[in-house]
Amino acid sequence: AEDEKKYVKEISYDDLQQFIAQLRDIGIHPRSQARIISGIKSFYRFLLLDNYITNDPTELLESPKIGLKLPEVLTVNEINSILDTIDLTLPEGQRNRAMLEVLYSCGLRVSELTGLRYSDIYPKEGFIRVEGKGSKQRLVPISEVALREIKNYLYDRNSVVVKKGFEDILFLSRRGTALSRIMVFHIIKQQTEAAGIHKNVSPHTFRHSFATHLLEGGANLRAIQEMLGHEKITTTEIYTHIDREFLRKEILEHHPRSRPRT
């Protein structure tokens, strides 16, 4: 109705709270609510700077809490199933096996994996050198299993005609160039389906699984942060949420009081 309209100067904190409640009632997603509130706050900041208003009714306005979306994680058995279904009789079989072992063993980003060089591997020391975001380098421990698979792959790699400029790249395509990110996604999708795993698995899933399994095994969060190449510990802390979910499931599954008595 006409008499319900208000000028911008007349709108109060309570009016805005009512508006947000209406957004919630009509089913607007919390993320969309947060964007709307952010827009309103920006508008009122502009009015305040322009001296059109003297009080900002949005000052105490809070955005809705948005639930943390936990990344997909594979179990150890699922990882093993994916690796075990790789057909080593195929020309690219050993490459794929070594590649996925390294991905899981070291928790690499897909760009770090495709850019990995033969000269980045230090088998005696048990480390690989990784170039992460912003060209920052870090040393990451590599498992004996992954090193063995790389050694096996190198026999096949020697039969590939390598294009100029890619001589030091570890994981090569059939054309003798570095594997593309899309190709790595495709290989993982193919192997996940072959293993009968019905999850949305990507290269990043292996990275998430690496971090989660370390945390479940009792690894220090700072050590995981270092291995993942996270600048901030808060980025790594998402895995504590996954670990809590793992613990919750373990309790529900194994604790004698977790199920109602019949």
Task: Give the label of every model feature segment.
Residues 1-262:
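Conserved catalytic core of the tyrosine transesterase superfamily
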